[in-house]
């Protein structure tokens, strides 16, 4: 009945407007019905559970059903590229050569030797390398002292650097579970129980924690902009969050108990002691947060530009702003901490974040660039029931991604005139009124984010999406699916450290296995990841637009 409906075919303007309103009302009814049906089924399942029964089972039907709605925008964003398979054996290092002889009895009398035909075969050895160290021992009667030779670097305890390296790489790099790591080691002939495997993965990792700190500091210094995202991580059954900070040269992980603005600042400052300042910038943030005018005037009398620690700041609030509510106190502390972060001269300060529009990411940096892919997902979530509205949505989504493609082209060749044109086209595109109410409301919300979505026009080196951080979050999700979550804060720190080193090594083209083995064996022949980040940063110049501004 509604398949052939086209509002443009209705000549009477009032009738056309009335039909449009009725269609939007029908969409609202359909959306409410879907939500009510889902809630009813959830309540039925809960009632059955309370009765000791089971909820409605999920049984796949015999007849094919339409696939669930895909919220990904890969198809719209991607342009097909030609692909050809290259030879891999030409670049392989040869570990050994083996001459395969021909049985002379199989050759005719006139056969003449013509050299060799080379065939490269890849293989790997997985076997034990148990070493009996016979340490020389001397005794000095005059000194009453016994002198014993030390073990080579990397050998400490029952297990050598090979086992330690393999366990760490399998658990953190290959995302294997702890029991499976132990099972694989035992299948290779290693006599090891579950407890020592856990200790190898978590205990005595101070050197790697130090390397992670260096990686993060180098990463923050490598560009004035950073990606940021978060995902959940339970520690010993308690809710927590993992923050992912990255750019093209590194990825760093931080597990915390909260994800508010103060916690995000803790992450960006690498958990150093919090600092606060009462200045004009902080007052502006407090006013924007919604603090009452009376409280704002009280704060204005405290402006002194002096950096304070948390104890001093809390004492100041208790003395001059007594009775401040918990939410108001959080607003004030966050504003003062952000102002102190911007005034910091002792470490790298992130000037722009590429992220989604979560409220805890706002105010922290001078500029904010929103993810276009995340914004596009909002349109994919619209589920119009009326074919006419479906057509309107499809047509606008095509225009949305066509504009996105123009922004991608601008990144490659940024021209001031093109930036002006793209700004005008953005304003035209997101001033569209389709008549489909849900779509028009979403378009208006996108238009309100213009400055953050068009940040690429001022800084062409930043990506248009937050995929690098989201990919980092997916790695934590996979780790969480396999291992559920760390049981201790020491374990959570080990997760953060080794996932940081594994992801960063991959971005820098460094073998994570060889890197871990190099450090555990004590050879330290490979350069540090932090040094590599610094070298690559000079080559890439990830802050070019800031250097010229």
Question: What is each PLM-predicted segment?
Answer:
Residues 163-174:
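Short, amphipathic alpha-helical "recognition" segments used to contact nucleic acids or chromatin
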